Amino acid sequence: MAPSCPTRSRVWSSRTSPPPDLAESEAWVVMGRVSAPFGVKGWVKVQPFSEDPGTLMDFESWRVGRGEQQAQYAVEAVQDHGKSLVAKLVGIDDRDAAFALRGQEVSVAKSALPPPEENEFYWSDLIGLTVMNREGVELGKVDSLMESGAHDLLVVKGRREHLIPFVAAFVGKVDLAGGTVEVDWGEDY
């Protein structure tokens, strides 16, 4: 029985075994992280990284782990839980197994994601892009993104670290094919 949680939930009752592994060449997108066990029957609490916490509810399987240490799990059930989710993964049947997943990244197959709208990007597509300012000076590469209270920030690492708000006032053209981001940002900011 699922924990008592308000609002939406999804159950895949036909899921009794893990899904077959997708090809290793499959690209995966980190969509959240397991923050804690939830209850004593193997449920986990998940902190989504997407704007809509319910986005992860649309996927029947998740890859959980970090780096080379990842495993794919079928999602037996998932529910909204405030700004987070609680989920039951096939094969995670008690609190100890759920606790072992604490802090692990939750990823989904990139091929299962809808294409982004115009002028919207998946964070994973921005990682590694070269950041140039309007004067043609290379500031570094996008190392990661982070949320601030007001907006997302590009974390750019080069000779020094730059935290650049990912908003139209500072970010000009994003050229995924060319591997660059143009910004209105001084080298010494």
UniProtKB/Swiss-Prot annotation:
What residues form the membrane-spanning segments? none
**Polar residues bias spans:** 1-16
Q: Which GO terms of the cellular component aspect does the record hold?
A: cytoplasm; ribosome
Q: Which InterPro entries match?
A: PRC_barrel-like_sf, PRC_RimM, RimM, RimM_N, RimM_N_sf, Transl_B-barrel_sf
Q: List the disulfide bonds.
A: none
**Subcellular localization(s) per the UniProt record:** Cytoplasm
Q: Where is region (Disordered) located?
A: 1-21
Q: Which Gene Ontology terms cover its molecular function?
A: ribosome binding
- Pfam families attached to this UniProt entry: PRC_RimM (PF24986), RimM (PF01782)
Which biological process, per GO, is one annotated for this protein? ribosomal small subunit biogenesis
Q: Where is the PRC barrel domain?
A: 118-189
Keyword line: Chaperone, Cytoplasm, Ribosome biogenesis, rRNA processing
Quaternary state and interactors: Binds ribosomal protein uS19.
- UniProt family annotation: Belongs to the RimM family.
What this protein is reported to do is described as: An accessory protein needed during the final step in the assembly of 30S ribosomal subunit, possibly for assembly of the head region. Essential for efficient processing of 16S rRNA. May be needed both before and after RbfA during the maturation of 16S rRNA. It has affinity for free ribosomal 30S subunits but not for 70S ribosomes.
The domain section of the record reads: The PRC barrel domain binds ribosomal protein uS19.
Question: What is this protein called in UniProt?
Answer: Ribosome maturation factor RimM
